[in-house]
Amino acid sequence: MKASIYDFTLKELSQLLKPSFRAKQLYLWLYAKYKTSFKDMQNNFSKDFIAYLEQEFTLRTIEITHVRESVDGSKKYLFKSLRDNHTFEAVLLKMKDKKIDEETNAILEGEKYTVCVSCQIGCQVGCAFCFTQKGGFVRNLKASEIIQQALLIKEDNNLPIEKALNIVFMGMGEPLNNLDEVCKAIEIFNTGMQISPKRITISTSGVADEIPILAGKNLGVQLAISLHAVDDKTRSSLMPLNKKYNIECVLNEVRKWPLEQRKRVMFEYLLIKDLNDSLDCAKKLLKLLNGIKSKVNLILFNPHEGSKFERPSLESARMFADFLNSKGLLCTIRESKALDIEAACGQLREKKLSQQI
């Protein structure tokens, strides 16, 4: 089976292709011009070189099979692997962006885009509140399949080449259980799609053994920890992984995470009605995160088929956030984008091609 050209970093292609400058030319065609056929690259390459590329590599290995758009402008994408027909989802989040013109001080309004990518088909972690785990675990995604999610979404929305994207590994799967492919994808996002590591966030359920390995790679990405509870009993009931890596174990590794000045580790906290949304929980969370340069992102539980949990009121979420902010712990409430198309946090899963998304 031919390798996908999207699986190769710039360094790897430079070592593989002769002369080595061909690698940069090829990257330009792939990531700046969205070319999906080697024959479309004839301006730079000889017929012999194109024949070599066609013999050794393939290009697109996934395709968009369905798109569903939310009233807020967000879109949920169903992708299909062209190799094994398995499906997975990703989401484009569209938000308003305001900037101040340095010369005129005028407020400039625009739009910013975040792509929530998947790194696995299914998930091994088995969080009780997450719809992804109901489909079971199928396999890891390759770097090329991660990259193509963002590439195809950008192409589908006619976003200019120079339009910066934010990338969040918050789709299907646990990034630290597919760390090699995730790290390779991050390198390609940076050198190929020109996405700064500062615009990339890896969200983990807390695979503590892998956190120092990720830190040692010095990728410069943002780290987010899915905490969701303030005691081990509750967290273990929500996240079975906690029985192996409890709260103390995870926080010990987070304390060692290298932070740039002014940067913080994000803690994601899913608020579930009458389970972890009380003021007492907020007080315990404040104590847990003492000494960690952090911020808390509250997420109101997003309902899905078969779930026993309930979404808390916005009022209780605001009380929770107001308490933490009043004590100096930065806390925000995440806006539930794409809730109407079941593309919000915890609502993605593999679907059969006959299913509607």
From Swiss-Prot:
Residues 109-340 form the Radical SAM core domain. Pfam families: Radical_SAM (PF04055), RlmN_N (PF21016). Its EC number is 2.1.1.192. Gene3D superfamilies: 1.10.150.530, Aldolase class I. It is found in: Cytoplasm. It comes from the Bacteria. It catalyses: adenosine(2503) in 23S rRNA + 2 reduced [2Fe-2S]-[ferredoxin] + 2 S-adenosyl-L-methionine = 2-methyladenosine(2503) in 23S rRNA + 5'-deoxyadenosine + L-methionine + 2 oxidized [2Fe-2S]-[ferredoxin] + S-adenosyl-L-homocysteine; adenosine(37) in tRNA + 2 reduced [2Fe-2S]-[ferredoxin] + 2 S-adenosyl-L-methionine = 2-methyladenosine(37) in tRNA + 5'-deoxyadenosine + L-methionine + 2 oxidized [2Fe-2S]-[ferredoxin] + S-adenosyl-L-homocysteine. Specifically methylates position 2 of adenine 2503 in 23S rRNA and position 2 of adenine 37 in tRNAs. m2A2503 modification seems to play a crucial role in the proofreading step occurring at the peptidyl transferase center and thus would serve to optimize ribosomal fidelity. Belongs to the radical SAM superfamily. RlmN family. This is Dual-specificity RNA methyltransferase RlmN.
